[in-house]
From Swiss-Prot:
Source organism superkingdom: Bacteria
PANTHER family attached to this UniProt entry: SEPTUM SITE-DETERMINING PROTEIN MINC
A Pfam entry, by short name: MinC_N
Protein family: Belongs to the MinC family.
InterPro entries: CAP/MinC_C (IPR016098), MinC (IPR013033), MinC_C_sf (IPR036145), MinC_N (IPR007874), Septum_form_inhib_MinC_C (IPR005526)
Summary of the function given for this chain in its UniProt record: Cell division inhibitor that blocks the formation of polar Z ring septums. Rapidly oscillates between the poles of the cell to destabilize FtsZ filaments that have formed before they mature into polar Z rings. Prevents FtsZ polymerization.
Protein name as annotated: Probable septum site-determining protein MinC
Top-level taxonomy: Bacteria, Pseudomonadati, Pseudomonadota, Gammaproteobacteria, Alteromonadales
SUPFAM superfamilies documented for this protein: Cell-division inhibitor MinC, C-terminal domain
Entry keyword set: Cell cycle, Cell division, Septation
Oligomer and partners: Interacts with MinD and FtsZ.
GO process terms (BP): cell morphogenesis; division septum assembly; regulation of cell division; regulation of cell septum assembly
Length: 221
């Protein structure tokens, strides 16, 4: 029997949600550029759902926002939380309207995996553990990036960038034997070098979220 030319099947994907909290596109552009500068390769071509629930202006410049994101090589999958006037703009621009809702209690969760890398991660390299944790047996050098949807464990020095909870997991942690990072991030909350310098006395530690703020605890590793 000949295989059909196409099939329509249901599926689910993890997408990042960009919350727009201010109608000022210039301000949005500045803050977005700051975030993109932190990890440009991670965000490049990233599919986004844009949440506009904080925008009440019916004449909001959605076309301008779309152009702003496209010019930075971000891909808008659709919008959510928009009032009807903005939703009509979205339809005219060919953007999908996505309904947000709570996941069913019975919906199966993706199995969590662990990616183990037994080598030093050098400048310019990026390691990503999708749908799971990342274990690095080695050092993460300056200019290197390690990213995980779950937690990150580094059995060595962390001098580059480490981004855990990349899909929004606020329970993710970053553990390293020697923390001297350019950036650490959990579920979008991040510290740069200057933030980490305030905790310079802690070398081996666990970085986690406490509410919406990062905190670091000393460990004996």
């Amino acid at each position: 029997m000949q295989k059909p030319s196409l099939e329509l099947k249901g599926s689910s994907f993890t997408l990042s949600v960009l919350h727009i909290n201010d109608a000022d596109l210039d301000g949005v552009a500045r803050e977005l550029d700051d975030k993109l500068a932190i990890a440009p390769q991670f965000f490049l071509g990233a599919p986004l759902v844009v949440n506009l629930s904080a925008i009440s202006d019916p004449d909001y410049n959605l076309a301008g926002l779309k152009d702003l994101l496209i010019s930075r090589q971000l891909v808008i999958v659709g919008i959510t939380g928009a009032p009807s006037a903005i939703a009509n703009q979205a339809k005219a621009l060919g953007l999908a309207l996505i309904k947000s809702g709570k996941q069913s209690q019975t919906q199966p969760q993706l199995p969590k995996t662990t990616k183990i890398v037994k080598q030093n991660i050098r400048s310019g390299q990026q390691i990503y553990a999708q749908n799971g944790d990342l274990i690095i047996i080695g050092a993460v050098g300056n200019g290197a990036e390690v990213i995980a949807d779950g937690s990150i464990h580094i059995y060595g020095s962390l001098r580059g960038k480490a981004m855990a909870g990349a899909n929004g997991d606020k329970n993710a942690v970053i553990i390293a034997q020697n923390i001297d990072a350019e950036l650490v991030s959990i579920a979008g909350q991040y510290w740069l070098t200057e933030n980490l310098q305030a905790h310079a006395s802690i070398k081996s530690g666990c970085i986690r979220l406490d509410g919406d703020s990062l905190t670091v605890e000393a460990l004996s590793l």
